[in-house]
C-alpha cells in the first residue's frame, strides 16, 4: 500500500489524476505486489521559486534494496518530469516504513472504497 504525496507551487500546471496513475503504474511495474497507491496533492499558493517535491512511502521488504530503490527512483523521475511543462526545482524522496508502522483497510458494513472490491 504505497503512499504518494506531491507538494508543489501552484503555478505548475499538473494533471494530478494522470500524474498519480503514471506513478502507480511505475511502482507496480517494478513491484507487482505493491498495490494501490494512496495519493495526495498539495498545491501551494504561497511559495518562493517554482518547485515540486514528490514523496513516495513504501513498506520495507527484502527485495526493496538499494539497487531496486535506485532503479525505481530513476524511472519515477523520468515519468514525473514528463508531466512538468515548465522549469522547476525538483525533489523526489523514496522512504521505507519503520518497524512499528501499521497499514490495513478499515471497513464499515455497506460502505465501499473506490477501486476496492467489497469481498474480503
Model region roles, listed by residue range:
Residues 91-113:
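Short, highly charged C-terminal tails/helix-capping segments
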Residues 10, 43-45, 96-98:
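Active-site-proximal loop/turn and secondary-structure-junction residues that shape catalytic pockets
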Residues 114-120:
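Short acidic DE-rich linear segments
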Residues 47-49, 64, 100-102:
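Short active-site-adjacent helix-start/loop capping segments
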Residues 50-91:
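Mid-chain, well-packed structural core segment of small domains
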Amino acid at each position: 500500500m504505497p503512499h504518494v504525496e506531491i507538494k508543489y507551487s501552484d503555478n505548475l500546471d499538473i494533471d494530478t489524476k494522470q500524474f498519480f496513475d503514471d506513478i502507480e503504474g511505475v511502482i507496480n511495474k517494478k513491484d507487482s505486489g505493491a498495490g494501490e497507491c494512496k495519493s495526495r496533492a498539495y498545491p501551494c499558493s504561497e511559495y518562493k521559486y517554482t518547485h515540486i517535491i514528490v514523496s513516495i512511502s513504501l513498506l520495507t521488504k527484502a527485495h526493496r534494496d538499494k539497487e531496486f530503490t535506485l532503479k525505481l527512483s530513476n524511472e519515477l523521475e523520468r515519468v514525473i518530469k514528463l508531466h512538468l511543462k515548465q522549469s522547476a526545482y525538483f525533489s523526489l524522496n523514496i522512504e521505507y516504513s519503520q518497524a512499528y508502522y501499521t497499514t490495513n483497510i478499515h471497513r464499515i458494513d455497506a460502505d465501499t472504497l473506490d477501486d476496492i472490491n467489497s469481498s474480503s
